């Protein structure tokens, strides 16, 4: 028992020392100075002294000013979400003391202070409220390099940072509190190792400004290469570690029971030295044991197999695939909503029995696709394979698919132009990731409104990518005898000659943009009274006649920016050009959508004369040539 107490006591101090040394981010701006004991110094001391109590009184966030120009002092303080009032107060008192001690005569400074939690304090002689502060930069990381599995780890890293940026910059709380612009996340790197990360912005920022600040923080550091670090500016902070850190991950720092004796400075130093020796010895021992194990044991299972769910868990989550939980059905199988024991919601795709893959292939390909993570892609959480069952598990997206809003008269009113534009841009970003930025090159081949899911913030997420490998469809990279996809979205060269490329997705994207603008389906446009054989020819006719805004959904009632809508129609018509070489790629499309300084080419007629002979057979189909999603994946 006595030995256990000593070990617990040693562990307590090891943790404490690691936390104290983890980050120390006081940054004094050297652009201005004041004279000690003058009015500015007095005002600074007064407002920093009261900062802790003010932040607690205002539920975790506070900003104010004191004095008159040129001795006016502006201040801001906050604690991360969930911090107890006393802990928040203690942290901010430490932060205020550090600022005054380490920045004795600077007129501007800030600190992100880890003291039982993470808190922030900033002061300046000029107002900074609602302004993004990107100077001075503070960046620190450990000296421990990560040297193995870098490709795999950086894939996880990119997905984690994208997800955190999206979550942290979500404007889900309208009040200026510490709950706004804050996200913490734990992600599996291996079966035995996690990465812990936190992002937050000061709550006074606009949503876009927060995202830009965090994006700059991520790009400032680059890929995952050190075991821990922090990047901070006056307006945002990004911290990560391979071990949980205090405040964000519910750690506590209370000494072991019975250890109430006072500790001398000498004893503390002895503990520090002993800790260093113990860590060195243990590290060496671990390396030796691992090396021996590698020589004698078979290779450890890849981290990807942690993605596997057992069938009982899936059946319990979906009430044994109850029809009342069914979300939809396609060529590859049925999709159900599920709720796991911890209350988290999932979407379950139960694949049909036609898949030709074996167990190992299914595991490998699913794990490969699961690494493809982006804020505008539906996340693949894992799989289940028992007996004849092959099941994919996805994140659950609450607002279902775009088509259920866009083409439903009672719901389309919820899609104002701002939301539609966000969906257009977000979808483009998701497809760009698949085409260019993912570890694989992916051609979706069934991009349509029903494959664009909408989250709680109406942020678009591209669904059903990666199924070609998982389902083992017989296809080649450049052409296929089996035309797959949904009628109305298929490019001419693919439909007539079986040739597909990234430009096939661009064509589908152009059709989708026209649908989003008009609120009309291209696939059954021939059934309407509108002039034109389909939505594409109808849009071209209005463009040619100088009346493109006639295409706009009447539900919008002129509540849109004409120039922005006009530009989107222009881009859509460029995407549906007959010649694939004349269609822009997704990176160009995003620049066209987000920058008015780019001059757009003049579109040519998108009407493909040879298509008429194919239209009767297409129109006779109830939903698609193959209602499933097929895509093409090519290792980079």
From Swiss-Prot:
Cytoplasmic side of membrane: 288-636
Keywords: ATP-binding, Glycoprotein, Kinase, Membrane, Nucleotide-binding, Phosphoprotein, Receptor, Repeat, Serine/threonine-protein kinase, Signal, Transferase, Transmembrane, Transmembrane helix
UniProt topology in membrane: Single-pass membrane protein
Enzyme Commission identifier(s): 2.7.11.-
Residues with the Phosphoserine modification: 450
Post-translational modification Phosphothreonine, affected residues: 486
Residue intervals on the Extracellular side: 26-266
Residues at the catalytic site: 446 (proton acceptor)
Gene Ontology CC terms: membrane
Residues recorded as bearing Phosphotyrosine in the entry: 394, 494
Catalytic activity from the UniProt record: L-seryl-[protein] + ATP = O-phospho-L-seryl-[protein] + ADP + H(+); L-threonyl-[protein] + ATP = O-phospho-L-threonyl-[protein] + ADP + H(+)
Superkingdom, taxonomy of origin: Eukaryota
Keyword Transmembrane helix found: yes
Residue ranges of every copy of the Protein kinase domain listed in the record: 321-600
MF terms (GO), sorted A to Z: ATP binding; protein serine kinase activity; protein serine/threonine kinase activity
Signal sequence interval, chain numbering: 1-25
Compartment annotation: Membrane
Entry-linked CDD domains: Gnk2-like, STKc_IRAK
Recorded coiled-coil stretches: none
Residues the record lists as binding ATP: 327-335, 349
Record's protein name: Putative cysteine-rich receptor-like protein kinase 33
Protein source organism: Arabidopsis thaliana (Mouse-ear cress)
